């Protein structure tokens, strides 16, 4: 399995909420080192309001709802990325819509 970090918009998340696969550009970490993974997350966060963390068999595969491991977003404007579980997709969408 490969962990990927996908910069995403509210429209991307709505596709996942509708149980549709998401074909989107993804980033991978330089290694499995925690710092490299964090760096990939931060780079992905520069390009979109939300980062989807997913585990895929192939980095080129579409992201399916069951592949999602977390959502990350700056929920309070502090610059810090908050972590949301896959089951909190509706809450993440609500935050983006405010």
Please name every model-derived segment.
Residues 1-25:
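Short, extreme N-terminal segment that most often corresponds to the first beta-strand
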Residues 2-11, 45-53, 97-98:
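Generic hydrophobic segment detector
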Residues 17-71:
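ADP-ribosyltransferase catalytic core
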Residues 50-98:
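Glycine-rich, aromatic-bearing surface loops/beta-hairpins
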């Amino acid at each position: 399995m490969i962990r990927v970090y996908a910069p995403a918009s509210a429209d991307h998340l709505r596709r996942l909420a509708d149980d549709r696969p998401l074909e989107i550009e993804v980033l991978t970490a330089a290694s499995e080192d925690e710092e490299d993974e964090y760096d990939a997350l931060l780079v992905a966060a520069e390009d979109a309001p939300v980062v989807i963390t997913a585990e895929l068999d192939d980095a080129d595969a579409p992201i399916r709802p069951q592949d999602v491991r977390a959502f990350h977003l700056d929920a309070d404007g502090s610059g810090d990325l908050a972590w949301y579980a896959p089951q909190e997709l509706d809450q993440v969408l609500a935050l983006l819509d405010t």
